[in-house]
């Protein structure tokens, strides 16, 4: 379904459908993904939550469908990563005028980590930080104020600084079935008919959905 409204709840201006407030072509968001912010205007997600995301790098933030992103969650991109390969972490190439350097070499000031990819049905907790280049699998949960520096497998709960796995949400067989069903790709009407199954802990009910 094509979204036609920013706010999913009547009278609630703290939650937005994130896809409908994004203007940056290097940020891709799936349907029904929501962002909640009770401190700032949630429509300012690009400015307040996606940091060091400079066009010169071409790296992207890709967020899947039906994700829930809590207030203050941050996505830190490549330009925030000073190069650790050189003998100094100082970003000389950024100040090319001052040091009479070639502007085209500006990207050598940092280590390029690539795209940041968030799967479908991911819950990112309050003030969590997702570092550049991280891949988070479908159904994962990122704990409050966790700092995620490494990839997170599907349906895994992580927390802490740096974030470490706490446990899997389900056994491997159930996770495999969930990844096969991919309910988030169903049409709106099928989802409506099967919300009870989606909210249950019964994978068989989900597999048998019509």
PLM regions: where:
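C-terminal segments of enzyme domains that contribute to small-molecule binding surfaces
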Residues: 93, 100-130, 162-210
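N-terminal capping/interface segment
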Residues: 1-19
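Hydrophobic transmembrane alpha-helix bundles
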Residues: 4, 70-72, 175
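Core FKBP-type peptidyl-prolyl cis-trans isomerase
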Residues: 84-86
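Structural signal for interior beta-strand "rungs" in well-ordered beta-sheet cores
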Residues: 15-82, 93-98, 105-165
